[in-house]
Amino acid sequence: MQSIPIKNVGADNVSQLIDRFERQYVYLRLSVTDVCNFRCNYCLPDGYKPPSHKQQFLSVSEIQRVVRAFADLGTEKVRITGGEPTLRKDFLEIAHTVSQTNGIKKVALTTNGYRMERDIDLWQQAGITDINVSVDSLDTRQFQLITGENKLQSILKGIDRAFEIGYRKIKVNAVLMKQYTAPELDKFLVWIKDKPIQMRFIELMETGEMDSFFQAQHLSGQSVMQRLLQEGWQLQPKALSDGPAKVLSHPDYQGEIGLIMPYEKNFCASCNRLRVSALGKLHLCLFGEEGIDLRDLLSEDTQQAQLEARLKAALQGKREHHYLHIGDSGIRNNLASIGG
């Protein structure tokens, strides 16, 4: 896909999602479930606990309507997230539905990789164009310690299979932690030397349930950035639909490094994504307050104009930046409910 110049928004601005700060939103992160089967120490260390009241996640038809509205307003990329989205029995139908929406050019999946080895061929057939998979350690025992699951070797086989069936690049996520991830940096670099993997280190973010863990494990991505720059890695330009990662490449490496540093100054200046939760709420920011309900406008196709009007109106309430730097993570107790 050709990248779109960031400054040249185009003549048809009226139909686009643009906020008060001239940021254009072409990227939707769509959560389809809160449920996750991993127990990652930085997210859900005690595992997923269902709420006392029964929750009904978005149906395929509701997903179709919300994606259609976003696409009509200029969204080009949808990332399906969770929880773990592949746990839904109708996941393949969801992926196919999103991929068939007019205007959507990329359908990405964020997964813990639990079913990747088994189902990667089916994901591709359903229309998944891009995959992000979490690998917080390349050591089997350490991986199980972090995630609560002994699935590392299966996930690595799933990544290899993705390349075999034609995926040109796989993005691999690892949360940057002093005790766990940081000591394995050299091992990750060796791994991506001859593989087209974008290895993304995500700064640990402070959330309501994880304050003490954050204090013990947080490591600035800038320290990794400085080391890489000193070793000959170079920053790469970004396309409009790209995520927040600062991407570095090296002439001796087939893979890349991505650094996601939400505490960095001006992190929000290039924000290009909105979020819809599995319960049908629009979230203007990962660390914002209570979401804006869309579900009452997702039951009939005839409601699309009203839905688009609500999206555009809600966007004008988006803040210029988050307040993580002063310890305000909004109402977010963990990241599983909205897909990070």
Swiss-Prot record:
Its cofactor is [4Fe-4S] cluster. Pfam families: Fer4_12, Mob_synth_C, Radical_SAM. Residues 20-246 form the Radical SAM core domain. Pathway: Cofactor biosynthesis; molybdopterin biosynthesis. SUPFAM superfamilies: Radical SAM enzymes. The keyword Secreted does not apply. InterPro entries: Aldolase_TIM (IPR013785), Elp3/MiaA/NifB-like_rSAM (IPR006638), MoaA (IPR013483), MoaA_NifB_PqqE_Fe-S-bd_CS (IPR000385), MoaA_twitch (IPR010505), MoCo_biosynth_MoaA/MoaC (IPR050105), rSAM (IPR007197). It catalyses: GTP + AH2 + S-adenosyl-L-methionine = (8S)-3',8-cyclo-7,8-dihydroguanosine 5'-triphosphate + 5'-deoxyadenosine + L-methionine + A + H(+). Its EC number is 4.1.99.22. GO terms for molecular function: 4 iron, 4 sulfur cluster binding; cyclic pyranopterin monophosphate synthase activity; GTP 3',8'-cyclase activity; GTP binding; metal ion binding; S-adenosyl-L-methionine binding. It comes from the Bacteria. Belongs to the radical SAM superfamily. MoaA family. Monomer and homodimer. Catalyzes the cyclization of GTP to (8S)-3',8-cyclo-7,8-dihydroguanosine 5'-triphosphate. This is GTP 3',8-cyclase. It comes from Actinobacillus pleuropneumoniae serotype 7 (strain AP76). The gene is moaA.
